Amino acid sequence: VKATLKTLAVCAALAVSGLTQAQDIKIANIVELSGPGTTAGTLFKNGVEMAIKEINASGGILGKKISYTTEDTQTNPGVAKGLTQKAVDNDVFAIFGPVYSGSIMVSMAESKRGETPNFTGGEAAAVTAQGNPYVFRTAFGQSISFPKLAKFINTKAKTLAVVYVNNDFGKGGRDTLTKLLEGTSTKIVADISTDAGQVDFSAAVLKAKQTDADAIFVYTNEEESARALREFRKQGVKKMLIGETTLTGQKVIELAGEAANGAMAHVGLTVDAPQFKAFGEKYKAEYKSESDHNGIKGYTGMYVLKAAIEKVGKLDRKAVAAAIRGSCFSTKQTPGILMDVCFDDKGDLDRESFLVEVKNGNPVINATLPALNARK
């Protein structure tokens, strides 16, 4: 009996070992599934999952399948840090999320400790200014997107009112734009702070309206952007409302309704661009809802990881992180990245982007802008 039990134990151990080998690329999704970041986190997670399903269906990476877990940060930086620590201790190969800048700023110390590649949707300039060699963006940081935005504002407005959310994301954008506009033809005439999760925008909108600025820059997270747009229209503001991706995303348009019409934004990722249309259709078929830039971030980030692992040719976290920094990846080599992309040594990415205006409830691309540091 003892021999039989021993044999069974050995067989069970081998079975578990075989299972681990078959699924030895472990990914942790650490995202905002509750709290103010629910929209961004859910779509980002869905994009990652969609890419994983596709990659596994086509044979995995280096013949290995991907397994993944999903955890909710509750849009809380402390929770995000604890979950990242847990993922590192569980020996995951890579981490996707958090999406919010305030959370990744706190949690990335743990992925650095574990030498674990960490893909984030966070856009605050400070995220990649910490010298963490394991953090990579899935969308523009403010140091890449805002110079393009500032050039556009210079051509449209002599005076500008700035409405921003008082968190790492909002303050980072406001500070970056302020510096870029110093000494230019555009003067900032109002600096209006709002709270994360703010419901009532009447006072902030009234302040902006009273400046009579040529244009108003709105830099808040998705749900707040929709509330702000509704209030601008309610107060009869006719001036140009300009922002970044979070002003004209699909969720914002759904929540703001007609109030979103006329809003303009510099957008790095949109399902309305030809490069992303097929992704948008696949996402809608899978999740019965529209994706926005967050879904594309998660999806393309997973394919960047795939391309980097294949470039290295082995499952070595440190080598894979090094293979992303200072490198370019093409759609010819890895179609799933959807658009050619280059990373610098800090983990910031650069690629083409778009100027979008909401017309009749749909984001319409007015112009395609080249990569900021386009390689000749």
Residues covered by each model-derived region:
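Sec/Tat signal peptide C-region and signal peptidase I cleavage site
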Residues: V16-A22
